[in-house]
């Protein structure tokens, strides 16, 4: 039996072409006249390489004319030669959906990686789908409470919205995504889908182990197309994960959390594919279709009536340049942005969120309420004034400031440190359990802090703690130690002349 005959039995189609050119992951295939497959159709080629037989999946990317199609391979093309038969499946790439995908790891083609052969009999959906119709969208806006003080107070997340974590290399994007998976799964239940797009394979394995240890793997589906995969796979893996999430939203009427790490790699893979297809590059070398490709993905991530897909996306910022077309294009689709800053990270404040650079569309009295909005704006005002004064402090010293500004600087430094928090995802590194602070307590604590109710407490007491009880406990501990050494019973005060001194004290604490 020939390979073409076997493929005909598998796919039910006799539309068979042959390979005429192979250039890396780009494959040109010639079909009989009048039988050219449609764009995005999946093609299969049976190849043998070093005594190993495998099925190669290609996706039609261009029609070249004269019955020729140009395809992108989803796997390495080692062993693929001219003349090999290629069969049109008559459909696009599809992935398994349903309750059975939870607790397992899949690749972009829907093959189970942790249990080969698992899921072959599941219902399958095409990864290329249209977004919900406008009249099906959910008109209400609701906040998603996370238990992280800096997020809930200053950049509240939208249930059913799109949230991005911006930052350069090594500032904690993946750790924060792992933290959110833990928090959402433990506090709210529901289903999570994780898409690993072009990131480190080691991180994918670590995530798998951590989710299993936290007992949340049973409610999570993972789809990986990591950095060792061809660009075609890295470009499609986000769509595969989104398709699984859409099933839970549309068929099971569930609220779903979709995590994408990293959306920049999706753009990067699209750029590689565009170059391989011979398209003229656009700004900074990116593909001319960047906005369309991003829109096709982001428009499907939305809330329909009574159910939602809430997406959290890590966005790598090349060279910390926010004007780069990749992060700039992502901005247009977002409901909330959380910027992770290297300067905040260097102070040892985790999560390293820059509160002045982060934003949310629902930080509005009509959504979060008057009290939440008022407290958030006062905290932002204090932090912004502190930032404005830092040049003067660096040149002249804090003693040259007016008394009012001195007091504001002291208060701002306490606010900065109180925005830090121990995280569940980092327990194995810090040895400290993660903390969750209810929104009401967060608002109350920062209201008191911004009014000066805690000005007498040492700065170190605010560092890497949870709510008000933790603050009182740590302040009493530090106060007792400092009284014993000073002997005069004076309230504990910290030296604020230098940021570096305060930061060193925080780290020691």
UniProtKB/Swiss-Prot annotation:
Q: Bias category Basic and acidic residues: which stretches? A: 496-509
- The membrane spanning regions, by residue number, are none
What SMART domains is this protein classified in?
A: AAA
This protein's membrane topology, according to the annotation, is:
Peripheral membrane protein
Q: What is this protein's function per UniProt?
A: Produces ATP from ADP in the presence of a proton gradient across the membrane. The catalytic sites are hosted primarily by the beta subunits.
Q: Which family does it belong to?
A: Belongs to the ATPase alpha/beta chains family.
Protein name as annotated = ATP synthase subunit beta
- What gene does this protein come from? atpD
């Amino acid at each position: 039996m020939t390979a073409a005959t076997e493929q005909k039995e598998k796919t039910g189609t006799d539309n068979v072409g042959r390979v005429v050119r192979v250039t890396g992951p780009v494959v040109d295939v010639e079909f009989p006249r009048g039988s050219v497959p449609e764009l995005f159709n999946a093609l299969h080629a049976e190849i043998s390489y070093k005594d190993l037989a495998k099925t190669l999946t290609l996706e039609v990317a261009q029609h070249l004319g004269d019955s020729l199609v140009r395809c992108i391979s989803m796997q390495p093309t080692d062993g693929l030669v001219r003349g090999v038969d290629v069969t049109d499946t008559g459909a696009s790439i599809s992935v398994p959906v349903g309750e059975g995908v939870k607790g397992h790891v899949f690749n972009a083609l829907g093959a189970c990686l942790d249990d080969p052969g698992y899921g072959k009999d599941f219902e399958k959906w095409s990864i290329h789908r249209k977004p919900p119709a406008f009249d099906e969208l959910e008109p209400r806006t609701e906040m998603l409470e996370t238990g992280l003080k800096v997020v809930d107070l200053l950049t509240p997340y939208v249930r059913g919205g799109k949230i991005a974590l911006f930052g350069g290399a090594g500032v904690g994007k993946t750790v924060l995504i792992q933290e959110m998976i833990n928090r959402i799964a433990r506090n709210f239940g529901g289903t999570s889908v994780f898409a690993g797009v072009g990131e480190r394979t080691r991180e994918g394995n670590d995530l798998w182990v951590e989710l299993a240890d936290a007992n949340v793997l049973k409610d999570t589906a993972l789809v990986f197309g990591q950095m060792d995969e061809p660009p075609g796979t890295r470009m499609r893996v986000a769509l595969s994960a989104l398709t699984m999430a859409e099933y839970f939203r549309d068929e099971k009427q569930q609220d779903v959390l979709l995590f994408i790490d990293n959306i920049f790699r999706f753009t990067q893979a699209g750029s590689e594919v565009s170059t391989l297809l011979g398209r003229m590059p656009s700004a900074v070398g990116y593909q001319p279709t960047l906005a369309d490709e991003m829109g096709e993905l982001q428009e499907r991530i939305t809330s329909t009536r009574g159910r939602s897909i809430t997406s959290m996306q890590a966005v790598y910022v090349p060279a910390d340049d926010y004007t780069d077309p990749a992060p700039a294009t992502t901005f247009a689709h977002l409901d909330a942005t959380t910027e992770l800053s290297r300067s905040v990270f260097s102070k040892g404040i985790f999560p390293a969120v820059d509160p002045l650079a982060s934003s949310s569309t629902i930080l509005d009295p009509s959504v979060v309420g008057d009290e939440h909005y008022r407290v958030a704006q006062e905290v932002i005002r204090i932090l912004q004034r502190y930032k404005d004064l830092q040049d003067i402090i660096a040149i002249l010293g804090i003693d040259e400031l007016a008394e009012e500004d001195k007091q504001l600087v002291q208060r701002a430094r306490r606010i900065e440190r109180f925005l830090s928090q121990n995280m569940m995802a980092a327990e194995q590194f810090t040895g400290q359990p993660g903390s969750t602070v209810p929104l009401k307590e967060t608002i109350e604590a920062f209201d008191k802090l911004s009014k000066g109710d805690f000005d007498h407490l040492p700065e170190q007491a605010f560092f890497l703690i949870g709510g008000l009880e933790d603050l009182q406990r740590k302040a009493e501990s530090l106060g007792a130690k400092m009284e014993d050494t000073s002997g005069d019973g004076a309230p504990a005060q910290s030296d604020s002349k230098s940021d570096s001194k305060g930061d060193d004290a925080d780290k020691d604490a």
